[in-house]
């Protein structure tokens, strides 16, 4: 595993699918810059529909445009994470396995993985990953055919199953994010509730999460 990953309370996701069928690079970059201006220090770039060429082009521009201290993770594509100069990769249950991703990126880059129930989390906990994600905690519209809702009670239960950093994702808003941290998550991943006025929203999230 890589060393030195300290998960911030807010794990912001820049999801290209939220910006229309052909999101412009300028739009994505401006959005990411606004998040960072609001205090975000870690970003995941997610693009489920784009070609490898498009994803790499976008990722490289994000890397160029953002301050070097911002940790950048790429969803799904370990190979493109390396090519873009990102700090790590995040893989899901239907992507390259965590161990496969580790073989691709080596020991120096970060690897995280998504889980949706206690069984998946326990399996992933044995892999050489730097953090685990669990969700959806609440109902979400950011994913087509989402997995069953985990809920706060099950989040509390899975917290006891791992000592690794735990990211909660799915339906998390400014109204409920504090309850997610109180239930045991180290960080909350957010997509939808950052889309409008991202600088202000990020600042509000961080104020709540650190209260």
From Swiss-Prot:
Pfam families cross-referenced by the UniProt entry: TMP-TENI (PF02581)
UniProt cofactor note: Binds 1 Mg(2+) ion per subunit.
GO molecular function: magnesium ion binding; thiamine-phosphate diphosphorylase activity
Sequence positions that bind 2-[(2R,5Z)-2-carboxy-4-methylthiazol-5(2H)-ylidene]ethyl phosphate: 140-142, 171
EC nos: 2.5.1.3
Gene3D superfamilies documented for this protein: Aldolase class I
UniProt entry tagged with the keyword Nuclease: no
Statement: the UniProt record of this protein carries the keyword Transferase: yes
Pathway as given in its UniProt record: Cofactor biosynthesis; thiamine diphosphate biosynthesis; thiamine phosphate from 4-amino-2-methyl-5-diphosphomethylpyrimidine and 4-methyl-5-(2-phosphoethyl)-thiazole: step 1/1
Binding locations of Mg(2+): 76, 95
Binding-site positions, 4-amino-2-methyl-5-(diphosphooxymethyl)pyrimidine: 44-48, 75, 114, 143
Function: Condenses 4-methyl-5-(beta-hydroxyethyl)thiazole monophosphate (THZ-P) and 2-methyl-4-amino-5-hydroxymethyl pyrimidine pyrophosphate (HMP-PP) to form thiamine monophosphate (TMP).
Family indicated by similarity: Belongs to the thiamine-phosphate synthase family.
Protein name: Thiamine-phosphate synthase
Lineage summary: Bacteria, Pseudomonadati, Acidobacteriota, Terriglobia, Terriglobales
């Amino acid at each position: 595993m890589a060393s030195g990953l300290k998960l911030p309370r807010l794990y912001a996701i820049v999801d290209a699918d939220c910006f229309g069928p052909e999101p412009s690079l300028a739009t994505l970059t401006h959005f990411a810059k606004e998040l960072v201006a609001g205090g975000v220090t870690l970003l995941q770039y997610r693009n489920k529909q784009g070609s490898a060429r498009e994803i790499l082009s976008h990722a490289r521009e994000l890397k160029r445009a953002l301050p070097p201290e911002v940790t950048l993770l790429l969803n799904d594509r370990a190979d493109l994470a390396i090519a873009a100069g990102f700090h790590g990769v995040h893989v899901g249950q239907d992507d390259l396995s965590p161990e496969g991703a580790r073989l691709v990126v080596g020991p120096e880059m970060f690897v995280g993985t998504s889980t949706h129930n206690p069984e998946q989390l326990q399996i992933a906990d044995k892999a050489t990953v730097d953090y685990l994600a669990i969700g959806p905690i609440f109902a979400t519209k950011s994913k087509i055919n989402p997995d069953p809702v985990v809920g706060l009670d099950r989040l509390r239960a899975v917290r006891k199953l791992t000592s690794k950093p735990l990211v909660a994702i799915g339906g998390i808003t400014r109204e409920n994010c504090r309850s997610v941290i109180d239930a045991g998550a180290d960080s909350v991943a957010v997509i939808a509730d950052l889309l409008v006025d991202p600088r202000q929203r990020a600042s509000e999230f961080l104020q709540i999460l650190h209260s």
